[in-house]
């Protein structure tokens, strides 16, 4: 039967991608339905209890700048906060929070349930309704049909999911949840290029059986940072430390002796695992010369004794897991409360997507999250926001939106996926962004909140707070640029103390702030400097923008040069076999990828600068060379 209600957007899956997709669609006015196999697991952290990290924290801040919910939930559920790379430049500094699983999930569910125009319904989805070459709805496991002109699939590891523990394996989307096998079979019938990936999780430990005195304590930062631009440190729950342990040669011997029982090495698992989060058996094999590997013992929450040993993800048999855990100093008496496992699942080649994350083969269908070959909560959530936004924009008859590589890490993520594809779970790093000095955590709001406001993603309170910060920043920048400090007004002793030496000539405060060892607080000690601004975020922006002004200017120039051709659109049906001078290899790659712009074409592996020049010549001759709006 058909459900009596009609929706604009249907989101399938209530994980990190699904919740952001549903929230984004509803925020801009679309009647949205979020379908999940269990309302109790909406917003669940299926793997490690943490948000953020290098590159990932940048995505969380961008989601927040666009009105998303991940950062707010992390602030309310975070039980340890740290700024990574704090001694390095601002481009690579990143926030990471250890989260209480229950508090985080509750924060997400609360946001979803209180969002206007967003309905929740508990049912798995077994089929898509396809009519006239486009998706028009879904069919649930009980045969109930929901209709909508836009459907977003955010199904995580559930498509054809198979869990492996040693020689045993069984169907599942994660431990305790069934796989979406019917939907996986249906998608395999459609014209998508499907493959398999693998990820894993470590055994969970009972913290009461760990000898904490033998481990190295790793405290959080004090004061603790926040993720959200609206967040405050006093919103954080109680803060707790993590601890560090180490494997030893005996641990590695146990693992090597059981490799023939590992599904990864016996050939049972065919999917490719994450390069940057390898299993412990992978680490022991790939880094055979290392006598020890770090393990981070992370608390799962404030009201549980369960501990997540980050660094020993494994699919080895339980008896081997038991032995290897107890070979680690400090864990000799540790009790395993949940076994580690690997999970293998379907994903679809993301080169079959538009930059909006709508599929090229079926109109009205968007993919977001692990279905596109990514790994990580943050990567999934960012894609979900973009997919849900564009699904709603389509229904409303509005122009699509997606960020460029120089605008956001989200732009880098999507461009990498749709241009280059992936053969292994894709993880975001700052090193993937060529314009990373412009794409910092601290300026995500300045980059994206005005865009989010125009799209309808940003509410009045966030917009008010953002404008207050932006106006304070602009006022103080103007004041620093206009305020002169003269040598005669500055005692030599104070000049040496603040500036490192006497002031030789008249200088503006703005110029003095560009000195590497001079901070804003130092400047405010100078006679005639005026009153300081109280907002720490404004001060941070003043220092970064002054200190890195020259580098930022050069990067802006690089962006301008690159954008001359970056946004030149390529006709969707362009016949690459008619472009004179292109090699067969380049023609095949362009035809397979179908890049939307010249910039995307240039980033396809194997497409040379010479090939791009030939492409531009062809477009010019055909009268197709026009600037994109």
UniProtKB/Swiss-Prot annotation:
Domain of life (superkingdom): Bacteria
Positions that bind FAD: 13-18
Localization annotation: Cytoplasm
GO-annotated cellular components: cytosol
Chain positions recorded as NAD(+) binding sites: 273-287
One Pfam family recorded for the sequence: GIDA_C_1st
InterPro entries xrefs: FAD/NAD-bd_sf (IPR036188), GIDA_C_N (IPR049312), MnmG (IPR004416), MnmG-rel (IPR002218), MnmG-rel_CS (IPR020595), MnmG_C (IPR026904), MnmG_C_subdom (IPR047001), MnmG_C_subdom_sf (IPR044920)
GO terms of biological process kind: tRNA methylation; tRNA wobble uridine modification
Quaternary state and interactors: Homodimer. Heterotetramer of two MnmE and two MnmG subunits.
Function statement: NAD-binding protein involved in the addition of a carboxymethylaminomethyl (cmnm) group at the wobble position (U34) of certain tRNAs, forming tRNA-cmnm(5)s(2)U34.
NCBIfam families linked to this entry: mnmG_gidA (TIGR00136)
Name of this protein: tRNA uridine 5-carboxymethylaminomethyl modification enzyme MnmG
Species in which this protein is naturally found: Alkalilimnicola ehrlichii (strain ATCC BAA-1101 / DSM 17681 / MLHE-1)
Phylogenetic placement of the source organism: Bacteria, Pseudomonadati, Pseudomonadota, Gammaproteobacteria, Chromatiales
């Amino acid at each position: 039967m058909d459900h009596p209600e009609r929706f604009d957007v249907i989101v399938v899956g209530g994980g990190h991608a699904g919740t952001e997709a549903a929230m984004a669609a509803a925020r801009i006015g679309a009647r949205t339905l979020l379908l999940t196999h269990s309302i109790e697991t909406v917003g669940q952290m299926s793997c490690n209890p943490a948000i953020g990290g290098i590159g990932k924290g940048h995505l969380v801040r961008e989601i927040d700048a666009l009105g998303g919910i991940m950062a707010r939930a992390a602030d309310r559920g975070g039980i340890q906060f740290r700024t990574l790379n704090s001694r390095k430049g601002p481009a690579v500094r990143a926030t990471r929070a250890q989260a209480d699983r229950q508090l985080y999930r509750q924060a997400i569910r609360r946001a979803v349930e209180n969002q206007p125009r967003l309905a929740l319904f508990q049912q798995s989805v077994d089929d898509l309704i396809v009519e006239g070459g486009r998706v028009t709805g879904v069919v649930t496991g009980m045969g109930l049909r929901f209709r909508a002109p836009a459907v977003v699939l955010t199904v995580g590891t559930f498509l054809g999911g198979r869990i492996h523990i040693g020689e045993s394996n069984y169907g599942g989307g994660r431990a305790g949840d069934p796989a979406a096998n019917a939907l996986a079979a249906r998608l395999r019938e459609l014209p998508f290029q499907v493959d398999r990936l693998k990820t894993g999780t470590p055994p969970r430990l009972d913290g009461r059986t760990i000898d904490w005195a033998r481990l190295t304590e790793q405290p959080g930062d004090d004061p603790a940072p926040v993720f959200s631009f609206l967040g405050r440190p006093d919103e954080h729950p109680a803060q707790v430390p993590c601890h560090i342990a180490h494997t030893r040669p005996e641990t590695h011997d146990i693992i090597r002796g059981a490799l023939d029982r590992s599904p990864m090495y016996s050939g049972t698992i065919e999917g490719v695992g994450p390069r940057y989060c390898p299993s412990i058996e992978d680490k022991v094999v790939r880094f055979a010369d290392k006598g020890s590997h770090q393990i981070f013992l992370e608390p799962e929450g404030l009201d549980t004794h369960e501990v997540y040993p980050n660094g020993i993800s494994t699919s080895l048999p339980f008896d081997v897991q038991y032995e290897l855990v107890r070979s680690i100093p400090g864990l000799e008496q540790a009790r395993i409360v949940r076994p580690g496992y690997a999970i293998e699942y379907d994903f679809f080649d993301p080169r079959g997507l538009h930059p909006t994350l709508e599929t090229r083969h079926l109109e009205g269908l968007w993919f977001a999250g692990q279905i596109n070959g990514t790994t990580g909560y943050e990567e999934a959530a960012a894609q979900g926001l973009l997919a849900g936004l564009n699904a709603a924009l389509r229904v409303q008859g509005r122009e699509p939106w997606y960020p460029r590589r120089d605008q956001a890490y989200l732009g880098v993520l999507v461009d990498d996926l749709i241009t280059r594809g992936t053969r292994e779970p894709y993880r975001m790093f700052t090193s993937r962004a060529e314009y990373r000095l412009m794409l910092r955590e601290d300026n995500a709001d300045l980059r994206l909140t005005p865009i989010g406001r125009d799209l309808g993603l940003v509410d009045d309170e966030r917009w008010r707070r953002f404008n207050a910060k932006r106006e304070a920043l602009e006022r103080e920048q103007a004041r620093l640029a206009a305020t002169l400090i003269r040598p005669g007004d500055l005692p030599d002793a104070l000049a040496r103390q603040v500036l490192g030496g006497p002031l030789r000539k008249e200088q503006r405060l703005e110029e003095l702030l560009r000195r590497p060892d001079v901070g804003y607080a130092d400047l405010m000690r100078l006679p005639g400097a005026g009153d300081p601004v109280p907002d720490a975020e404004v001060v941070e922006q003043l220092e970064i923008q002054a200190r890195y002004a020259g580098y930022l200017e050069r990067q802006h120039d690089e962006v301008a040069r690159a954008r001359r051709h970056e946004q030149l659109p390529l006709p969707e049906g362009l016949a690459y076999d008619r472009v004179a001078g292109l090699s067969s290899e380049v023609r095949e790659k362009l035809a397979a990828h179908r890049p939307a712009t010249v910039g995307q074409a240039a980033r396809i592996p194997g497409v040379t600068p010479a090939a791009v020049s030939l492409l531009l010549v062809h477009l010019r001759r055909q009268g197709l060379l026009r600037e994109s709006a």
